[in-house]
Amino acid sequence: AGGNLGVDVHLSGTVAAAREAALHGRRSVAVSQYRGRSQAIDWERASRWVARVLARIDSLTLEPGEFWNVNLPDPATAPEGHAGGDPPIIECAVDPSPFALLFNETPAGWVWGANYHERPRRPGHDVAICFGGSIALSRCRVV
């Protein structure tokens, strides 16, 4: 588990599967759950959130070569007061901001050392939406 936000879409196997399906003309969606490191996944809650997303995108049109990328927020940051306490689903663009370039030398070699949650983000894009406690729904293109 983990988010596939922003530039993660270029590295993610989850997103690659949806992208490959789109290449073959299939409707597809990649779903990821951002969460704190020590937090266990609440599969019942995640299933409920995904069911809401699927109901929403079922009626939306995708152009050839498009697919959906969905990021569920950390339940600890999801706002209360929505239907069933569930977070809103917000359509947004994928954030193009690069990760911070911070590496630490260790006995095993160089390791990326930037803080994932403190990554750069643009307001209204998937990283900010998901980190703000809402479900980020992004339309992506294969090429």
Model-identified regions with their sequence ranges:
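Glycine-rich phosphate/pyrophosphate-binding loops
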Residues: 22-45
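Glycine/threonine-rich flexible loop motifs
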Residues: 3-12
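Electrostatically charged, flexible surface regions
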Residues: 43-143
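General secondary-structure edge motif
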Residues: 1-2, 117
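Active-site-proximal beta-strand/loop segments in catalytic clefts of secreted hydrolases
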Residues: 1, 31-34, 72
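Short, conserved loop/turn and helix-capping segments at secondary-structure boundaries
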Residues: 11-15, 44
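Hydrophobic/aromatic ligand-binding patch that stacks against planar heteroaromatic rings
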Residues: 17-21
